[in-house]
Amino acid sequence: MILNDLGVVDYAAAFSLQERIADGVYRNATPETLLLLEHHPVYTIGRAGCEENILDHSIQAIRISRGGDVTFHGPGQLVGYPLINLRPRGCDLRHYLRFLEELLISVVADFGVSAFRVPGKTGVWTDQGKLAAIGVGVRHWVTMHGFAMNVNNDLSSFERINPCGIATCPIASLERLCGCPIAMDEVKSRVAGRFQGLLDEWLPAAGAL
């Protein structure tokens, strides 16, 4: 597994990189990879998305191939794009989604935050609102897209959309929940440290001991 911390990058550049890595993973020419990054401000619209859920068009909106509806990405939000071959791991996309939720729930617990799933909705939630959005796509059973967790970002841009198609969806950030400054590098470190072990626990590869 390769970890690549990209810093703050444009959405289009990150998507192009995902495509190249996913193709390499499919051909067994590239190791599975976790990209961690932040985006410049952008709205993304998933396959189930409706442009009417964007209430303000001052920020670029891009329609993409992940599942889900509309969400916002910007600095201070940790985005993770795992490029994982699910074929030797059982081709179980729903279980993969639950793995991503468990990863983030376990990470924020390190900061004293109690997060949880909501039945029938993909993502990570807290008593104060939704903390992380999750939307994935697959090509030849190689995953693309991933998760976006609010760490220390300005949440006002979420007020100009119906996030994930939910008109009254409150949005939380790790920093607001903790009531103190949270360093992005610390969150990245905890995500990176847990990712491989939890992936192998939830989705063990065929033949793995």
Swiss-Prot record:
One of its GO terms (molecular function) is lipoyl(octanoyl) transferase activity. Substrate binds at R66, G67, G68, D69, V70, T71, F72, H73, A133, I134, G135, G146, F147, A148. Its EC number is 2.3.1.181. The active site is at C164 (acyl-thioester intermediate). Pathway: Protein modification; protein lipoylation via endogenous pathway; protein N(6)-(lipoyl)lysine from octanoyl-[acyl-carrier-protein]: step 1/2. It comes from the Bacteria. It catalyses: octanoyl-[ACP] + L-lysyl-[protein] = N(6)-octanoyl-L-lysyl-[protein] + holo-[ACP] + H(+). It is found in: Cytoplasm. InterPro entries: aa-tRNA-synth_II/BPL/LPL, BPL_LPL_catalytic, Octanoyltransferase, Octanoyltransferase_CS. The record marks K130 as: Lowers pKa of active site Cys. Residues 28-203 form the BPL/LPL catalytic domain. Keywords: Acyltransferase, Cytoplasm, Transferase. Belongs to the LipB family. Catalyzes the transfer of endogenously produced octanoic acid from octanoyl-acyl-carrier-protein onto the lipoyl domains of lipoate-dependent enzymes. Lipoyl-ACP can also act as a substrate although octanoyl-ACP is likely to be the physiological substrate. This is Octanoyltransferase. It comes from Pelobacter propionicus (strain DSM 2379 / NBRC 103807 / OttBd1).
